[in-house]
Amino acid sequence: MTTLLIILAHPHTDDFSWSLATVEEFKKSYQESHPLDKIIIRDLFSEKVPALDNETFAAWKRNKYAPDTLSAEDKNLLHRHEEYLEEFLSADKYVFVNPMYNGFVTAELKQYIDVIAVPRKLFRYTENGPIGLLEGKKSLHIQSAGGFYHNEQDPTHMANDLGAAYIDQTMKMVGLTDENRQQLFVEGYARYPERADELKEKAFTSAENFGKAF
């Protein structure tokens, strides 16, 4: 059975969310086109992904040198790390969903990638650089932004989107080929509110098409 892992890295508010609405259109289309596939949704804002902080590094050290001294809190923390990693490894396709925050992804998504990007699991180091271990898998990055950052008529703004480049480069590092790393940008709705309906329809149509082919 093919497994699709959707990673939601978006806060839940009463306001309309362009990225969350777009991924819902994608999911609906995907389910219709892949009825036998398993879909897992990780909501990072609700789950509070563990950070790589002092507690984490201390738990790692105790686990390596003195595992008998691990506390219940240590064991729970390490278990959560392992759970995120194993789930990511077991999936065949990934969808990352986030708004652009100050030219980057949300802190929750960055923390999640820090947790799952484990050497010798997702990639290995060689004298010629890292080699990815997730060959054959696919990713789709859905990102919303109020302005335009990926306008073919004005590509200069792409340099301001560090988040999309980060996700793409990370997936490349772990072994996903160029054709298996895809992006869907939902943009311009704040800059041109009078075009909101047009931009929404464009985003939803793209999401539907991605859902059919992904």
From Swiss-Prot:
Catalytic activity reported: 2 a quinone + NADH + H(+) = 2 a 1,4-benzosemiquinone + NAD(+); N,N-dimethyl-1,4-phenylenediamine + anthranilate + 2 NAD(+) = 2-(4-dimethylaminophenyl)diazenylbenzoate + 2 NADH + 2 H(+)
Name the needed cofactors. FMN
Asked if the record carries the keyword Membrane, the reply is no
Q: Which Gene3D superfamilies match?
A: 3.40.50.360
Q: Provide the residue positions that the database annotates as binding FMN.
A: S17, W18, S19, S144, A145, G146, G147
Identify its protein family.
Belongs to the azoreductase type 1 family.
Record's subunit section: Homodimer.
Name this protein carries in UniProt: FMN-dependent NADH:quinone oxidoreductase 1
Q: What is the lineage of its organism?
A: Bacteria, Bacillati, Bacillota, Bacilli, Lactobacillales
